[in-house]
């Protein structure tokens, strides 16, 4: 196992665990609060969980040296809107269970990557077809995703984030 892939997997697991811990501690009222983009906290937690498989699919394409084609921010926004409509009332238990399941699967996939695969680069349509590495995709999407939404959730429920050393 690569030290780099292990470090990435640990960071993903840490973010997912922090998100699950926060979600579990929220009151029913906090669970239903809208974040800045209008989605409820409950929907955001489920969204992060549901995106891990898609984000990993794209990262694994780059790991294999294959381009990511046809994925645009317009498409991402459409996926998010559809998800909001379908999971606007998802239960806390369901969202947290999916978060734990999908983050564990994503971490396992990351751990299986070699340094060579992490360094493979190919055009990524989501980023103007820039030739980006698998590691960049992992850091910018599945690893960062939970932290990004944690900040939004903490802001809406009035919690202050205290950065911790890695």
PLM region spans:
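Alpha-helical bundle segments that constitute or directly flank the non-heme di-iron/ferroxidase center
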Residues: 2-28, 50-61, 140-147
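Active-site rim elements
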Residues: 4-6, 91-96, 138-139
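Internal, well-ordered alpha-helical scaffold/interface segments
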Residues: 17, 42-46, 97, 104
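Short, contiguous alpha-helical
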Residues: 32-78, 121-166
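Short amphipathic alpha-helical segments at helix-loop
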Residues: 1-4, 36, 84-91, 130, ...
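Charged/polar positions within long, soluble alpha-helices
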Residues: 21-24, 28, 53-60, 104, ...
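Hydrophobic alpha-helical segments and helix-packing faces
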Residues: 5, 12-15, 37, 41, ...
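Acidic/histidine-rich alpha-helical segments that form the ligand environment
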Residues: 11, 79-120
